[in-house]
Amino acid sequence: LFAETRARSTSLAAKAADVVGKSLAEEEKKDLDKISKKILNDNEHTDLIKNLATLVKKGVAFHHAGLNQNCREIIESEFRNGKIKLLASTPTLAAGVNLPARRVVISNINRYDAKFGANKPISILEYKQLCGRAGRPQYDKFGEAIIVGNSNGTELIDYYVNGTPEPIVSKLTDDRALRTHVLSLVSTTPGIKKDEIVGFFSETLAGSQIREPTIKF
């Protein structure tokens, strides 16, 4: 269940907990109680952690960058094992993590865009990425994706389902991002020469897209 913010993912998990909890068998409740205790035993008892542990007892969890690595790994592992039945997450879980989700629900197609200072519909590319979490080949024969939207369903299908993803554009063309990565490269590669820095970034996606040296001294 994908949400647009950390707070929203936590809220959706809480709303789903009572419904999911009613469908659990006694043996499942025992397993979830152990997972809940592990979360509490391994982490500082902040309000966030205590809330997570409470929801896990009902077969539900949330997942976002506000949780530490230990909690995220426990949640991912137990969802993968089928112990946690429903996972509410921010879009960060859409990339790089392979989880056995039969069904993906996109709870809101709008995201806040700081550049424009307003909410904007997600891109077709992000939609495809989110939906791609459902029905992973090694876990399921098929997957389902559901959009919760306010507009006409046919329009959503035409735009998102039948639409072509936008071209991928490197973020390194942004001065701030490039500066951060240059400093990171220099700090982790003692003795690196100027032409090596230029060569390194010229081989990135940004370098290939602008077809000229990414960095100029």
Would you name each region that the model predicts?
Residues R72-N108, K115, G132:
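Beta-edge loop/turn motif
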Residues F2, H63, L87-T90, I106-S107, ...:
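Generic beta-strand/beta-sheet core signal
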